[in-house]
């Protein structure tokens, strides 16, 4: 039986050809190499039908146009030449679409990304819906690649080089109103009239490109271009620290096309695409993509999740406010916040207002939609309105007795099916559930701050948590837009446990004489978004160090922080950015204010600030301890798989994505090399660097954590 086609042609009575995109058996339309023959057959029919007036591409999927190319095609390429051929085939197909003698219009609703936008760019005009689901972008850089089907050449000519570079270098996605303002689309219409609007455009002469703004025309000239690429190159190098080769190649390819013409530009694009596809950075980033997709499909347990119709939150502080926001505004669930103080409720409501009002100001959201989402959140100082909540998230202070009291109160005031989920970062879930009448419905749900930005949550069942409670909590996390990993109920869980020795070692080097800015710069150069000392300031020194004694009590001396350093800093009322002084000093303009190292830190902790270590040596000491602890977590079944370990580190800590996560990174170095480095460091700095047994065994056997495929585990 012949497989259904992803592209089908229908000709209307008014002689407009409608090409419907509908990849069989898939929720999302993605482009595959085998579709080229289908599109070419349709192009041939269009060319042969002299009665046709225009062509419209439209998707049959309810919420996406084309989400991009199928990434598996790249993984199947064994050489740069094979990947280059793939790009050239894509370029050729887009050129054939563009060469049609009648107007070709893309009718866009939902995600139009990567190869999907490149197809739309090959059309002569574009119409999109004003729906929030409609986004347009070229996110290939996030996979260590560049657009390979003409995107680097068509986009700068359509919207201007500086705007195009921002989109291609960052993977930034535009909403409909931004897209029409920049000239990326010709019109924005309601979804109900999308097809008719596209048909009307197709009946006209080919839409002419809007003239570029004067600034963009100047920047496209030789002098403006030279200045622009120099400035953007410098800014990009600072941002990527040279760790992402794709950004450098994007600049090179776009400039080639502008300076030497489209033929040279397309040639450079295809060659760069092929070479980037073979880089370890792209392979690691694609592995992260596959792993995160896999995690999002994981139900957490074999049991079916319980229905989720409404949620309660205990505590209206920073975390409670953030959790209320993602629950109401991302998951779309009614939220009831309980706080002992009305000010706590007001704080939580203001948190959501600020987030939504920012979207309204940026024209990402209508005021009516803001009001609709805010109406989902309400507050109370007692348990009024909690009787039928399906799940309660506790976000009160880190105090065991208080959390146990919350469990008792929820069991008294809520339905018998209600799940109690604690947002603890350090307390054992088993202890929180110790006196529960229904311990099987108690679970940990650990969010990271700021809640609306951090993609990871840890879901922590204790020994008696039911499979259905796990599945229901995983379901909620996904509805909130989070990537959940299920971890074991042991001190520090996973993320904080691997983060603690990393930060401890940074503080230890500080006491040895390394300068604060040198330590932070070394880890940023390695690939972390911020250095460990700045991270401590951002989280809050009081908050970030609270877990240290818990971990030391559980795991011993390797988690001990340098004596008296933390207490000296806290006793000097240094909490980090939140009170304007930590290891750094901050101005008065909140989170955006500039920071500078406070030189008073050095005498306060008895350090000289005269370092001797190179940046790679600093990074090595911090990172090796993190890797060792990650392997211990796998060995102790704190994490269920290396997949979860890599995702947890990348999404929870900012472990360099281009290295693929701790386990991918160990594999790339080789377990033998990691063991050798750690043994050398143990000789130099002490037993905390002793490699764990599993690493030593893997070294002796020549084993790796991951198999060669993207999703299979060893």
Curated annotation (Swiss-Prot):
Residues 306-714 are annotated as: 3-hydroxyacyl-CoA dehydrogenase. It catalyses: a (3S)-3-hydroxyacyl-CoA = a (2E)-enoyl-CoA + H2O; a 4-saturated-(3S)-3-hydroxyacyl-CoA = a (3E)-enoyl-CoA + H2O; a (3S)-3-hydroxyacyl-CoA + NAD(+) = a 3-oxoacyl-CoA + NADH + H(+); (3S)-3-hydroxybutanoyl-CoA = (3R)-3-hydroxybutanoyl-CoA. One of its GO terms (molecular function) is 3-hydroxybutyryl-CoA epimerase activity. Pathway: Lipid metabolism; fatty acid beta-oxidation. The record marks 118, 140 as: Important for catalytic activity. Its EC number is 4.2.1.17, 5.1.2.3, 1.1.1.35. It comes from the Bacteria. It is found in: Cytoplasm. PROSITE patterns: 3HCDH. Residues 1-190 are annotated as: Enoyl-CoA hydratase. Pfam families: 3HCDH, 3HCDH_N, ECH_1. One of its GO terms (biological process) is fatty acid beta-oxidation. Catalyzes the formation of a hydroxyacyl-CoA by addition of water on enoyl-CoA. Also exhibits 3-hydroxyacyl-CoA epimerase and 3-hydroxyacyl-CoA dehydrogenase activities. This is Fatty acid oxidation complex subunit alpha. It comes from Escherichia coli O1:K1 / APEC.
């Amino acid at each position: 039986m012949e497989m259904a086609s992803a592209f089908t042609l229908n000709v209307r009575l008014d002689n407009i050809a409608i090409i419907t995109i509908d990849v069989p058996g898939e929720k999302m339309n993605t482009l595959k190499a085998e579709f080229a023959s289908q599109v070419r057959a349709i192009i041939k029919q269009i060319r042969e039908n002299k009665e046709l007036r225009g062509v419209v591409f439209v998707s049959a999927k309810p919420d996406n146009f084309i989400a991009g190319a199928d990434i598996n095609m790249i993984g199947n390429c064994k050489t740069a030449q094979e990947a280059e051929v793939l790009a050239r085939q894509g370029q050729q197909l887009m050129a054939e679409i563009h060469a049609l003698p009648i107007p070709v219009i893309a009718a866009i609703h939902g995600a139009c990304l990567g190869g999907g936008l490149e197809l739309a760019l090959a059309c002569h005009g574009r119409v999109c819906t004003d729906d929030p689901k409609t986004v347009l972008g070229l996110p290939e850089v996030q996979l260590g690649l560049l657009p390979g089907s003409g995107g680097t050449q068509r986009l700068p000519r359509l919207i201007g080089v500086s705007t195009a570079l921002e989109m291609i270098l960052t993977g930034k996605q535009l909403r409909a109103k931004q897209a029409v303002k920049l000239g990326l689309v010709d019109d924005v219409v309601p979804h109900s009239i999308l097809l008719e609007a596209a048909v009307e455009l197709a009946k006209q002469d080919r839409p002419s490109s809007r003239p570029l703004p004067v600034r963009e025309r100047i920047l496209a000239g030789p002098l403006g271009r030279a200045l622009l690429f120099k400035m953007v190159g410098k800014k990009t190098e600072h941002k990527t620290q040279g760790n992402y080769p794709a950004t450098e190649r994007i600049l090179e390819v776009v400039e080639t096309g502008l300076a030497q013409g489209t033929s040279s530009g397309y040639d450079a694009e295809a060659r760069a695409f092929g070479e980037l596809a073979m880089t370890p950075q792209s392979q690691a980033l694609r592995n992260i993509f596959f792993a995160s997709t896999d995690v999002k499909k994981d139900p957490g347990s074999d049991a079916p999740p319980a229905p989720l119709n409404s949620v309660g939150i205990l505590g209206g502080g920073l975390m409670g406010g953030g959790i209320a926001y993602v629950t109401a505004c991302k998951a779309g669930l009614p939220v009831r916040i309980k706080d002992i103080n009305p000010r706590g409720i007001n704080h939580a409501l203001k948190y959501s207002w600020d987030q939504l009002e920012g979207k309204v100001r940026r024209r990402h959201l209508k005021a009516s939609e803001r009001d609709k989402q805010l109406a989902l959140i309400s507050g109370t100082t007692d348990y009024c309105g909690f009787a039928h909540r399906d799940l309660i998230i506790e976000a009160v202070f880190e105090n065991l007795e208080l959390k146990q009291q919350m469990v008792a109160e929820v069991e008294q005031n809520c339905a018998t099916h209600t799940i109690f989920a604690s947002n603890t970062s350090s307390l054992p879930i088993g202890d929180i559930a110790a006196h529960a009448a229904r311990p099987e419905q108690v679970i940990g749900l650990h969010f990271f701050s700021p809640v609306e930005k951090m993609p990871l949550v840890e879901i922590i069942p204790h020994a008696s948590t039911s499979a259905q409670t796990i599945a229901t909590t995983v379901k909620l996390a996904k509805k909130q837009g989070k990537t959940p990993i299920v971890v074991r109920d042991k001190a520090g869980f996973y993320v904080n446990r691997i983060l603690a020795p990393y930060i401890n070692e940074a503080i230890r080097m500080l006491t040895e004489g390394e300068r604060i800015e040198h330590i932070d710069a070394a880890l940023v150069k390695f690939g972390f978004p911020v250095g460990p000392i700045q991270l401590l300031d951002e989280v809050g020194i009081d908050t970030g160090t609270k877990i240290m004694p818990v971990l030391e009590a559980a795991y011993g001396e390797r988690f001990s922080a340098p004596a008296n350093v933390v207490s000296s800093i806290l006793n000097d009322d240094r909490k980090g950015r939140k009170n304007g002084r930590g290891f750094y000093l901050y101005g008065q303009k909140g989170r955006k204010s500039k920071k500078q190292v406070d030189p008073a830190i050095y005498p306060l902790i008895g350090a000289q600030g005269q370092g001797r270590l190179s940046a790679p040596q600093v990074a090595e000491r911090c990172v090796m301890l993190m890797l060792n602890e990650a392997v211990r977590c796998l060995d102790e079944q704190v994490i269920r798989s290396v997949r979860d370990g890599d995702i947890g580190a990348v999404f929870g800590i900012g472990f360099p994505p281009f290295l693929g996560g701790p386990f991918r990174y160990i594999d790339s170095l080789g377990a033998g090399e990691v063991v050798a480095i750690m043994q050398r460091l143990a000789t130099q700095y002490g037993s905390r660097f002793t490699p764990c047994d599993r690493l030593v065994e893997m070294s002796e056997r020549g084993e790796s954590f991951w198999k060669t495929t993207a999703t299979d585990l060893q």
